[in-house]
Amino acid sequence: MNKTQALEALNHDRARNSFLISTIEKLQDPEIHAADGSFAVYEPHDSTYLFSLADGGALAQLEPMLRHEYRSFYVNDLRFAPQAEQLYSGAQIQPYLQYYIESSEFVFDENELNGGVQIVKLDRSWTDYILSVYSQSEFSRRDYINECIDTLPCFGALWEGERVGFILVHTNGELGPIAVDERMRGRGIARTLNQYMFREYTRLASIGCLFVLIDNEKSHRLCSASGIKPMGEIMWVNI
């Protein structure tokens, strides 16, 4: 299936397929597989596959078509966890709530901004600061942070000249992470960072998405306050 055909099919449910759509849009010649209304897309930055499944048997149907080795994959519906566990022995499943943002609907809202915070584009001088406050082992690597800063719309927050927060876009196009110094929380700095990042990101992609751990209530509140819409529970699977 070619890029145009895949986007036409996936756009029938843009929210549910937001991650696959944004991935296909940014790739010149994406690897796409389809079977009976289900889809698999290869994401080359992270060497993962992204699945949109129509039924419980679709994962087993698509798997033999895949051309690359992979150690993790995404499925846009947590209900298919039993099928993933059956097909991949020892699979480790991590559920998330997925949010999405339609670029055509985003309006830069100055009411969300804190006028006391200065927002700047990130450069590599921020890398040490980011590593000092961002401790997720999978992504807390200097080379990874530098690649995000060099290639994607990432921003930092300054309060009276001091670094107090940042927001990144992952190399696979996923929005986030965002971090604000604990002593500076409650001042709208995260919402301000979101507004600047969304403004740049929506110029690059027709739709964006992010994933929040189910029990991360602070991030859920921030997403709701920022106008990002919930799509549903999804899963990342390590095999």
Ranges and model annotations:
Residues 38-114, 237-239:
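Acyl-donor-binding surface of acyltransferase catalytic domains
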Residues 57-62, 186-201, 220-221, 225:
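Conserved acetyl-CoA-binding loop-helix of GNAT-fold acetyltransferases
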Residues 79-91, 191, 214-232:
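Conserved active-site alpha-helix within GNAT-family acetyltransferase domains
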Residues 124-180:
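A mid-sequence, solvent-exposed acidic-amphipathic segment
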Residues 181, 185, 213:
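Residue-level recognition of the GNAT/N-acetyltransferase active site
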Residues 9-71, 159, 164-177, 181-182:
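Conserved donor-binding loop and adjoining core beta-sheet/short helix segment
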Residues 68-78, 201-214:
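Conserved GNAT acetyl-CoA-binding A-motif
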Residues 1-18, 105-140:
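Short amphipathic alpha-helix that is part of the acyltransferase structural core
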